[in-house]
């Protein structure tokens, strides 16, 4: 019987190994408030068929009963319907022709992938290299996997590639020269520290200048994924030595006594802004999302789990579990026994079939709310989760109104929003779960509808991977995407290899399946993408359930590092079924093994990022040392301001004037900062919201810094509003003059 990794006698398949297994976190009053919010409807105006018929009385005229069901079906509005004889005559024939051609291309694509698979099995993977490759899949521990990967690299000659500095996809001359300069200056600083000298600052300033010049995202191409796609383990020795040297230099600046604390703080703040942050993005995919548990487990065990996590649809449930638990709790939870708490699809066919016929949704919203609350630790809000774990949880939600903007719920945009309601909204796929109301926690702890009671649905329908929103709010420019959407996984193919998955024949310079196989695959996939865009731009696609379904194909689904857990055919059969402990164990193992090839790339990125954060947390802007506390994603105090603190946000004041009862019921506490961040892009991003429904916290500004720049808070907020207005004008004008996909998160299949 399998035991836990800690070495104790706890069975990983037993419910007793799950902490808080029998704990009911959700307050029944919260569930009743949610039920009331779902059933409450705005008052309907008094209407009648004409002046002499009763109000609200349904009177069916002769001949109208036959068209009743057809009239209720969602359709395009009059403004969206294109007029003209040719459009009316050619719309359906052209639509049928394109759909037929897409079907033909899909069959051709499937045959091409089968050919490439057979080519690799019969030509590429033979003999000893095949036996060494099989060794990779036998290990559930990263260290053992790494030894097997190094043995395979040695056999394939990839170790020799690592020792050669030259490579077309990065500037090796700059990296080599800069690495030597950093090493020389760092050794001088260390010598002065050993001699106890603290007066000279020239050498430290030189080291700081070098770091500010090179500590940037993808400087000289060192974060190019191609550098990690030529070997199973690691990258070129020159790149690895450079990253280790930069990390050592950042640590030396942190520990040096030659520079004042306020200078160190300013230095680390600039490094943090230039280098950016890393985020883990968990895609949707129904029960395929349980592969995310294995991905998170692999990152957690190797101490490379980012502090910024976002999830959509099924991925939102996994993200909520990660965002509300500490590391120690996660290590106990991410085991096969967790399957005993996953019971969302336990109903029989007759039960859910009657519900679907009656309500249009297969699953019951209240039942899902009750079960989802355990993963979110009850009615925990986004701010409370951040204060408890230090992790920044993000959940993508799409309004049921197709014309309203999406929201990335987190502790900045919706701090008092209850997490389980956002997870339900993100999983509300039309036909599976009806749109739900987001809930917010009031000052007395009770729940009330959020955003005026508007309803929300599945975020993956429009923003499966919200890269732009993450960059706006948290300066994220390095994304780790765990992609399990079944309709996307089928089309994933990297002809030149991926991170930790190189092309093995022709010394890495070949093509998977040969050049002909890769060329045919690329052509068919790009042609499929083209015809899907044609259908969308010509407005030929119908809208089942009132949803534009082309977005589920034409988004951007990948990131800087994309993890694709390998699925099996039985996953499609169980796509809406609860996993057994044995099946969850396989998904955990597969998720871990899919993550192992990416670990070294992620480690190199986070090694520098964590060193910068450590220096940023240790010092403050006023020159005082605050100690080496645990690293939080942002250098702000987790505590909130007092309840009597007044907001200086004009949007908050306007809402309080229009809704006097609101100010006494809702608590919008504001996060205090260790210091003033007047030029912090993250602070600016908070004040860039243009929607009055989303009240974001405002932070204190450095008056001296603002005076030096020559602009105040109000002027900054206005400049950001103007920026958004200009972007919106450019996007709308692109409809007439440019390709609209240039201004959206479009992505290839």
From Swiss-Prot:
Bilayer-spanning residue ranges: 92-112
Alphabetical list of CDD domains matching this protein: Pat_PLPL
Motif GXSXG, residue range(s) on this chain: 311-315
Matches recorded under InterPro entries: Acyl_Trfase/lysoPLipase, NTE, PNPLA_dom, Triacylglycerol_lipase_N
Residues annotated as the enzyme's active site: 313 (nucleophile), 458 (proton acceptor)
Main location: membrane
A Gene Ontology cellular-component term: membrane
Lineage of producing organism: Eukaryota, Fungi, Dikarya, Ascomycota, Pezizomycotina
Pfam families: DUF3336, Patatin
UniProt-recorded name of the protein: Patatin-like phospholipase domain-containing protein AN0408
Classification via PROSITE patterns: PNPLA
Record-stated family: Belongs to the PLPL family.
Biased composition (Basic and acidic residues): 1-11, 646-659
Organism: Emericella nidulans (strain FGSC A4 / ATCC 38163 / CBS 112.46 / NRRL 194 / M139)
Annotated ranges, domain PNPLA: 280-471
GO biological process: cellular detoxification; lipid catabolic process; triglyceride mobilization
């Amino acid at each position: 019987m399998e035991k836990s990794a800690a070495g104790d006698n706890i069975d990983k398949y037993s419910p007793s190994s799950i902490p808080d297994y029998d704990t009911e976190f959700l307050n029944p009053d919260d569930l009743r408030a949610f039920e009331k919010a779902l059933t409450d409807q705005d008052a309907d105006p008094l209407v009648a068929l004409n002046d002499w018929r009763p109000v609200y009385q349904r009177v069916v005229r002769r001949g109208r009963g036959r068209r009743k069901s057809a009239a209720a079906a969602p359709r395009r509005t009059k403004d969206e319907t294109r007029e003209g004889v040719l459009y009316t005559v050619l719309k359906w024939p052209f639509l049928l022709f394109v759909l037929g051609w897409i079907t033909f291309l899909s069959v051709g694509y499937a045959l091409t992938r089968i050919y490439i698979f057979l080519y690799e099995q019969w030509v590429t993977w033979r003999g000893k290299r095949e036996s060494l490759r099989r060794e990779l899949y036998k290990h559930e521990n990263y260290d053992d996997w790494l030894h097997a990967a190094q043995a395979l690299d040695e056999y394939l000659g990839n170790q020799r590639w690592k020792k050669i500095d030259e490579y077309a996809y990065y500037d090796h001359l700059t990296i080599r020269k800069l690495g030597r300069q950093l090493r020389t200056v760092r050794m001088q600083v260390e010598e002065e520290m050993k001699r106890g000298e603290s007066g000279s600052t020239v050498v430290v300033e030189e080291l700081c200048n070098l770091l500010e010049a090179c500590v940037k995202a993808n400087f000289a191409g060192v974060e190019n994924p191609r550098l990690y796609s030529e070997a199973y383990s690691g990258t070129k020795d020159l790149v690895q030595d450079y990253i280790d040297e930069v990390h050592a230099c950042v640590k030396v600046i942190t520990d040096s006594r030659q520079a004042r604390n306020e200078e160190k703080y300013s230095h680390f703040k600039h490094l943090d802004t230039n280098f950016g942050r890393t985020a883990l993005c968990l895609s949707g995919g129904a029960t395929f999302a349980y592969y995310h548990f294995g991905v998170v487990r692999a990152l957690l065990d190797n101490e490379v789990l980012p502090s910024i996590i976002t999830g959509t649809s099924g991925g939102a449930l996994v993200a909520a579990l990660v965002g509300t638990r500490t590391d120690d709790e996660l290590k106990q939870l991410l085991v096969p026994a967790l399957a005993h708490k996953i019971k969302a699809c336990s109903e029989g066919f007759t039960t859910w079939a009657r519900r679907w016929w009656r309500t249009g949704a297969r699953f019951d919203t209240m039942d899902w709310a009750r079960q989802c609350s355990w993963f979110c630790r009850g009615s925990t809000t986004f701010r409370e989760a951040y204060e408890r774990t230090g992790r920044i949880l993000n959940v993508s939600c799409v309004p049921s109104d197709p014309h309203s903007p999406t929201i990335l719920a987190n502790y900045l945009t919706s701090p008092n929003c209850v997490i389980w309601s956002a997870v339900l909204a993100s999983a509300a796929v039309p036909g599976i779960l009806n749109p739900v109301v987001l809930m917010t926690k009031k000052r007395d702890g009770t729940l009330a509808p959020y955003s005026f009671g508007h309803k929300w649905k599945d975020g993956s329908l429009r923003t499966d991977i919200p890269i732009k929103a993450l960059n706006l709010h948290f300066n994220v420019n390095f994304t780790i995407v765990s992609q399990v959407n079944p309709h996307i996984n089928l089309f994933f193919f990297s002809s030149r290899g991926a991170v930790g998955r190189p092309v093995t024949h022709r010394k890495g310079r070949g093509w998977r399946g040969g050049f002909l196989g890769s060329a045919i695959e690329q052509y068919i996939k790009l042609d499929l993408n083209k015809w899907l865009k044609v259908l969308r731009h010509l407005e030929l696609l119908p809208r089942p359930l009132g949803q534009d379904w082309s977005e589920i194909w034409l988004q951007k689904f990948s990131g800087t590092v994309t993890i694709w857990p390998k699925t099996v055919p039985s996953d499609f059969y169980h796509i809406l079924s609860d996993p057994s402990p044995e099946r969850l164990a396989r998904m955990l193992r597969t998720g871990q093994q899919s993550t192992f090839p990416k670990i070294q790339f992620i480690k190199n990125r986070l090694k520098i990022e964590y060193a910068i954060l450590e220096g940023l947390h240790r010092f403050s802007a006023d020159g005082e040392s605050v100690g080496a506390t645990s690293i939080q994603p942002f250098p702000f105090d987790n505590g909130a301001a007092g309840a009597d603190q007044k907001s200086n946000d004009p949007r908050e004041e306007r809402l309080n004037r229009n809704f006097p009862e609101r100010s006494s019921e809702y608590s919008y506490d504001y996060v205090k900062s260790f210091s003033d961040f007047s030029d912090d892009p993250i602070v600016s991003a908070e004040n860039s919201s243009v929607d009055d429904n989303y009240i974001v916290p405002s932070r204190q500004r450095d008056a001296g810094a603002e005076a030096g720049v020559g602009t105040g808070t109000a002027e900054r907020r206005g400049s950001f509003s103007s920026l958004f207005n200009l972007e919106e004008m450019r996007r709308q004008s692109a409809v007439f003059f440019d390709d609209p996909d240039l201004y959206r998160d479009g992505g290839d299949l």
